Amino acid sequence: MYYQNVSVGQLIKRVSRFTVEIDLNGTVEPVHMNNTGRNKEILIPGSLASVRYVDNPNRKTHYDLLAVQRQGRWINIDSLAPNHVAKECLEAGTLKLPGLALPYAVHPESTWRDSRLDFAGKAADGQSWFVETKGVTLANGTLAAFPDAPTTRAVKHVHTLTMAQAEGYQAFLLFIVQLPDIRQMTIYRDRFPELVTAITTAKQNGVRVLAYDTMTGPDQITLGNEIPFDEHLPFSEINLNSL
């Protein structure tokens, strides 16, 4: 996935939940951030940041924040990116769902029961499936973790996947880590222990959990390699005083 109309500037500060200030060639611009996470270890003043110009007179801001460079790697924090990447790869067959024959019929944003899941589809052999995608921006070294903030919505989605699996669908929980050079993925138990329990139960009932890292830059994010997932691995956040 490549972005157009991209510029690189310097992050000044986070102003509000959805707004940061970026210095673009000496001009301070308010920039929309499409990510509700805490992102404390990413939004460090002085960091390089990439933004996309949006030509929309009805908007209060003219730019969207795409990625921030931290410790030599670009971290994509566009919360819409994981679904775009997943859709492209599912349709192209470059993201293979274990046990399901290619090609896939892919239908985004499908409602099942009282939940809306990111993707529904059917494999070449007729097996129906669901995929719920979660973007991941929290990491410490080569270990990534989800969530960055408590999320009851994610628990609800996992419960829905578990029910769908019991009714004959093949259900998948897909984590897309929005930065490169990640070797393992876990759930941040200290942040939201209920999610660990929900995922463990889902796996025991046949739900498949997949995790991938990505190749990122100021103007791109593409699917990388599948990485091991273990919801029980311990995780601790980066010490901000060391940054």
Swiss-Prot record:
Pfam families documented for this protein: SfsA, SfsA_N
Disulphide bond pairs: none
Entry superkingdom: Bacteria
InterPro entries, A to Z: SfsA, SfsA_C, SfsA_N
GO molecular function: DNA binding
Gene3D superfamilies: 2.40.50.580, 3.40.1350.60
Family: Belongs to the SfsA family.
NCBIfam families: sfsA
Record protein name field: Sugar fermentation stimulation protein homolog
Organism: Lacticaseibacillus paracasei (strain ATCC 334 / BCRC 17002 / CCUG 31169 / CIP 107868 / KCTC 3260 / NRRL B-441) (Lactobacillus paracasei)
Gene giving rise to this polypeptide: sfsA
